[in-house]
Amino acid sequence: MKTFSAKSHEVVHEWFVIDATDKVLGRVASEVALRLRGKHKPEYTPHVDTGDFIVVINSSKLRVTGTKGLNKIYYRHSGYPGGISSTNFDKMQDRFPGRALEKAVKGMLPKGPLGYAMIKKLKVYGDANHPHAAQQPKALEI
């Protein structure tokens, strides 16, 4: 029997919506990364984008365990000397709800053109409203 290899034009990308209210950041991120990659499908092929579109709502209500709210630090650099800045999880959630989830999922995806295409299929919204009702996303429970 020949090994099956999915073709990019034959893959069906479904839409799912996840409610992140009171969910732990890492557990949501790992499930989202798995679904974006397509590893939950039997026709998964490593070199083809077989994943689904994921819409995450209520990302402002994500939580972390222990003292990570204060102790988990996110760094970024402007490119200039001395241009490093840092913020913790709580401040990032207040300013940019959902960015912590995007960064967590991005770190779990492959680096390169395929990974960059996968992260574009993630849509994160801080509240319950999203503009993807026309795609009729199915609810996904984590």
Swiss-Prot record:
Write out the entry's keywords from A to Z. Answer: Ribonucleoprotein, Ribosomal protein
The UniProt entry, under PANTHER family, shows:
LARGE RIBOSOMAL SUBUNIT PROTEIN UL13M, RIBOSOMAL PROTEIN L13
Q: What family does the Swiss-Prot or TrEMBL record give for this protein?
A: Belongs to the universal ribosomal protein uL13 family.
GO molecular function list: mRNA binding; structural constituent of ribosome
Q: Name one GO cellular component term.
A: cytosolic large ribosomal subunit
According to the lineage, what is the superkingdom?
Answer: Bacteria
Q: Which InterPro entries match?
A: Ribosomal_uL13, Ribosomal_uL13_bac-type, Ribosomal_uL13_sf
**One GO biological process term:** translation
Per its record, how is this protein called by name? Large ribosomal subunit protein uL13
The family database entries (Pfam families) matched by this protein are listed as: Ribosomal_L13
Q: How does it assemble?
A: Part of the 50S ribosomal subunit.
Q: What job does the chain carry out?
A: This protein is one of the early assembly proteins of the 50S ribosomal subunit, although it is not seen to bind rRNA by itself. It is important during the early stages of 50S assembly.
